[in-house]
């Protein structure tokens, strides 16, 4: 499989390169970050670009490691159902959908910004879980059935989002996960039966 046909790896490489460049250029970081007032001024590309920059190396590593871990299986499904760019379209749509509730909530807040691929990565994780609900995931080295992880992840995201503290966009994680499941069901309705 070449780099250009392995869309998961291609997205990871682009994200790493763009993040590294943005860390070196505050102007680039500010141009790509999700900033609602800029969106209102017509910079709608920020609904996507925010997902290609990360706050620091740990943020980038965790998201890209997770994307790599689950992306291959999900990529296969979306490419088989939607064609060669199916996974890329799914991933980009997940970025947009995951940030939309945040935009609606924060659109008049000039102090708000968001970055990172977590919402789209959550979409990939939840698509995988829907495809393989009884597979075993390692949660801090503890083996957990994927379906149990999903329930715990949703519960935590709802609780953490309700707390409203910190710099993590839990709403994007939750909405991304829901989008991942709905998109998977839309292209493979029979998946619900298993």
Descriptions of predicted regions:
Residues 1-194:
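A detector for small-residue-rich transmembrane helices and their helix-helix packing motifs
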């Amino acid at each position: 499989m070449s780099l250009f046909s392995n869309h998961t790896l291609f997205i990871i490489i682009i994200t790493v390169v763009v993040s590294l460049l943005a860390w070196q250029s505050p102007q680039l970081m500010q141009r790509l970050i999700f900033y609602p007032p800029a969106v209102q001024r017509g910079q709608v590309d920020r609904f996507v670009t925010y997902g290609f920059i990360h706050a620091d190396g740990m943020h980038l590593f965790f998201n890209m490691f997770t994307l790599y871990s689950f992306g291959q299986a999900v990529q296969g499904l979306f490419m088989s159902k939607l064609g060669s760019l199916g996974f890329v379209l799914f991933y980009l749509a997940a970025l947009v959908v995951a940030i939309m509730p945040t935009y609606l909530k924060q659109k008049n807040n000039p102090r708000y910004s968001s970055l990172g691929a977590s919402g789209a990565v959550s979409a990939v994780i939840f698509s995988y879980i829907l495809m393989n609900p009884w597979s075993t995931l390692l949660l801090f080295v503890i083996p957990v059935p994927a379906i149990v992880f999903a329930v715990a992840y949703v519960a935590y995201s709802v609780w953490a989002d309700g707390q409203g503290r910190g710099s993590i966009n839990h709403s994007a994680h939750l909405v991304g996960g829901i989008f991942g499941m709905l998109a998977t069901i839309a292209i493979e309705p029979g998946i619900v039966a298993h």
